[in-house]
Amino acid sequence: MGAALFLCAAFNSSGALAQDATPAKAPDRSSIEEVLRGLSRGHTVGQVAVSPDGKRLAWIERADGGAEIRVAPLADMKKSDRVTAASKPEQHCHEDDLAWSPKSNALAFFSDCAVPGDQTDLYLSTLDAKPVRRLTELKGYVEAPAFSPDGKSVAFLYVEGATRPAGALAAMKPPAGVIGEDGVEIQRVAVAETNAPKPGPPVMVSPANLHVYEFDWSPDSKELAYVAADPPGENNWWVAKLYTQALGGDAKAVLAPAEVKGPLHGFQIAVPRWSPDGKTIAFIGGLMSDQGATGGDVWTVSADGGAPRDLSSGRPTSAAWLEWESNDDLFVSELAGGNSQLIRLHIDVDIAAKTITTTFDPPIFSIPGSVGDGRLEMSLSASADHSLFVYKSSTFDNPEEFYAAKLGRKNSEELTFSTQLSHFNEGVEPAWGKSVSLSWTSDTFQVQGWLTMPKDYDPGKKYPLIVLVHGGPAAAEISHWGGGILSAPAFSALGYFVLQPNPRGSFGQGEEFTQANRKDFGYGDLRDILAGVDTVEAQYPIDPNRVGLTGWSYGGFMTMFAVTQTQRFKAAVAGAGISDWQSYYGENSIDQWMIPYFGASVYDDPAVYAKSSAIDFIKQAQTPTLTVVGDRDGECPAPQSYEFWHALRARHVPAQLVVYPGEGHGFVNPAHRLDVMERAAEWFAHYMPPS
């Protein structure tokens, strides 16, 4: 390759490696930084968990040097006490991942107090005057503790000898040795006894040749159900199976989506939950692009194996979490358009007719915002009798607080009483503009999205618009406080309208909508996005000559592809994107995710991959584009960004590439995250300045 195509590299103050020229007249970065730093406001809380008896609340909140656990009576959160493994009150540790004991008399949690910043271990607090007990001596990555129903054991996920957090979002290890064989890190289910006389290594339950992603105890505490796949775990979640295993026994596969017939064939499964009688396992199943971003239908399968049953087929929502109330009833947390809601699903079994029918109650609550307890996506914390659900919630306009939904009856009519439990952020106002939910028609679909207005919006002025596309694609933008690495609140505070669409392929409108972009990346979904821009321009004072596009991951792909399909965007910022699906197939650490979307491997059907590759249409690109990526990104590897930047530069299109050392797909260094947003703001301000 010619030396003329590359400039000398230089690190900026954040440690990022920048390639190519800066726009001719860069805006004042100090003023942008001042605005961005002013966005950090409000009290940040993490996981929240109600005790099984419904009387106490435990939660995580940020503290000096880490995170701490607080416990309080549900009726009066002001009377909270710190629960900690710290040896002195002034010692600050990182403590998180809560689990209540079934009798509500103890908390299990992870803490790094013994070796601050180095290793977390499992601890047990009986919430009395007795010292907190350390249960384990671990060396590796841990998460997701869960008490056995009899309270005698705590199971958790453990990567022994881990060099990095589990999952594809974390920075990948530098390649070395036999790829795919040497140094593969396997996540297993481990169990520690609560009455252990002294800390020690846990019992490894799941086999060493299976990577476990999530699990659930059987009601008799004798077995586990878990979702697992052959290593390497980062790549194989998309072909994972459902297993059961007796403690001390062998793993038994009860469901393999790749082998079943019907609508679950070849798709993904998540959130396994054992029924109270131990006969059935419920789970979420459907087309999912990322582990942890859960959406689909509610399914059940016999704990002994057999054909799975879809309990919510055709429902125009995306289930994300579930929990059994009885053997015939499930609570389901789901995304419905722009709302998060909790519903009850009834299962009616006619043994004589050999049929199963399901009915859905009206939502127990439906909120135009985010809900969750900090464990899984849209998961809730429930009392043992399921009369109380606790969660944290926020919107674009309201910071997060804890809430309780209490179920009751009056004259045989079921009622829900919702109560705000916390007031961490009372009086905190957003430093950005108001947000509204929009819907528009595209082809045969009704598409939903969110529009955030500029701070100090004046209807008499014309404004620029930035379109921010979410990742996934099987995900959804939900109204929530704050922003991501490319932040709608930040762009709003700087004077832009921001449109965040949920095009086809997103969660929130059922499996048909989620699957509507298969073999069609960049076409129908781009039409949905452009139709959303049309809607915004028709209803709000948008300057059509100042419309930009940005996004991360799948949103980064969409940014790269869109600028080769239309000249509508005046500037673009592509974060961790994909420019060439054919080369990407052989570069990434997660190639299994593409088969359900493209229908075949790139070696069997290269044309369907080329159809959606920006690089194949690069001669049509004219939009100035900033590209950013981490040098250890395994999901969307840096060569994809290099390839796109190189092609634009060769075509004399204004372009810049910034590579961040040590970062994976999800950036963790605060300085890098801030630098990405500052550079994006500068880029847009140069080519389409705010009013």
Where are these regions (language model features)?
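A flexible loop/linker signature enriched in serine peptidases of the S9 family
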Residues: 42, 61-70, 87-95, 108-123, ...
